Each structure stands twice: as C-alpha cells, then as structure tokens.
Regions:
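Walker A/P-loop nucleotide-binding motif
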Residues: 213, 230-241
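AAA+ P-loop ATPase mechanoenzymes
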Residues: 1-211, 215
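Pre-Walker A adenine-sensing motif
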Residues: 215-229
C-alpha cells in the first residue's frame, strides 16, 4: 500500500521500501518468476545491510530502516510538528493515513514470504548486532536516537499511539538533516546556491578533554552560570584547529 502514501512520498533511500512492498504484494503471484523475486529479496537485504552498517544501526534493521525514513523525511506534517509537537487541522488525518501504512510495515510478519521464496535471510536482520559504537555516517548519539525511536514505534499498540510517538520525536529533535545533526558547514558550489551541509560524524568533546586551558574554561563556565542565573553574560564563540 505504499503507493497510497500522501505525505511520505519520494523519500531518499525509499527504493528499498518500494521493492519490499512489491515482494509482499507479489510473492504468491504466478505472474512473476520465483527466482527473480528471490533475487530481488536478496538485493533488498544487501541494500539494507549496506545502509545499516554505514549508519551504525542495530537491532531489527527493517524497523530501524523504516524509522530512519520517518525521521529524515521533511514534509508538510513533519516540519509543522518541529518544536511545537501536535498540530491541528486536516494534516492530522492525512498523517494518520500514512502512519497506518507504516504501522502495517512495522507489524508485517515475513515468515510466509520467506517460506514461499525459500529464503531465510530476513532472520539475520531482525536481531542484528553491530560491531561498532557508530557508523561512518552517524555517530553514536544520532544512531541511538534512531534505534530508540525504532523500538518505541515497534511497541506502539495502535496507529494513534504510533502518531503520538513520532510527533513527540519531531517536537524534541526536529526532522531531516537539521533535526538529526547539531553541526553544519556552509558550502558554495560552483554555479549553484549556497548549501548547508551537516557534519554527520563528529566526536563528543567535553571541557575535561581540553588540556591546558584552565583559565579559559573557568571563564566560560562562570559566564554560562551567570547566563543561566539571569545575570549579565557575554556571547561566546568557541573555535579550534
């Protein structure tokens, strides 16, 4: 039913979803060659593994993939819910329609599909263990945020609960590259508009990691405390090479 999506359409990395949906709809059809369908299934698993390893995902990779799509897609509903959370109006009904489809995808049992195509490859990705704390694209903080949301969405009891859970995520973190990342760089491509590019894999640096700047760190901490307490404080910009 993914062709019935109204908001979450034309998503980046959405081809895997289209192919899996095609398999779900047609694995019992006599119109298609079983070996071709089986080959498509293994192609999907390959793409899912490549995406998951590069982003550091673990657990149920089908769920984390669907969650990644939902957390990344900037559409009329997801961008409207940033910061404010629940909204009013017809967008809610449209979003509920789309989330019903995603909930079906979350809850789908692949057992019969595996048996029909004589492939047990899906079992591997339902409880995948990552060997790294993060991936090449996402650091651990972003990876954990996606995996936590994935488990929360999988545990929802109905579509309304699914919608509330995802909407709360949009409220707390935002959506897309500006929501998932906290550092960016500005690029000026030739003959093109200025682009804001997320720095996708950054290390977490704490004040204790900075050696030899005790006086500067004390001034920064004191200034921050003054700001929090409502006293006079300076704007600060930290930079380094």
């Amino acid at each position: 039913r993914t062709n019935e999506l109204m908001l979450y359409k034309n998503m980046e990395y959405g081809e895997i979803l289209k192919d899996i949906t095609f398999l779900i709809d047609n694995y019992e059809s006599e119109f298609y060659n079983k070996e071709d369908l089986r080959g498509l299934l293994f192609d999907c698993i390959n793409e899912l593994l490549e995406l998951s390893v590069s982003h550091g995902f673990e657990g149920n990779l089908w769920h984390t993939y669907l969650t990644f799509l939902l957390a990344s897609d900037e559409n009329a509903y997801s961008t409207s819910c940033e910061i404010v959370g629940e909204i009013e109006g017809s967008l809610n009904e449209i979003a509920l329609h789309d989330f019903a489809i995603f909930k079906e995808m979350f809850d789908y049992d692949f057992e019969e599909l595996e048996k029909s195509l004589d492939a047990d490859c899906l079992k591997i990705i339902m409880d995948y263990k990552s060997g790294n704390s993060g991936g090449k694209v996402f650091n651990r903080r972003v990876r954990d945020r996606i995996c936590d949301l994935s488990r929360a969405l999988a545990a929802t009891q109905n579509v309304d609960h699914f919608k509330r859970t995802l909407t709360q995520f949009y409220k707390e973190f935002g959506v897309g590259k500006l929501g998932l990342h906290k550092a960016f760089r500005v690029e000026h491509p030739d003959n093109s508009d200025v682009e804001i590019i997320p720095i996708t894999n950054i290390a977490h640096v704490h004040l204790d990691d900075l050696v030899g700047y005790e006086d500067a760190k004390k001034k920064l901490v004191d200034n921050t405390k003054a700001f929090v307490e409502g006293k006079k404080a300076n704007n600060c910009l930290m930079f380094g090479d």
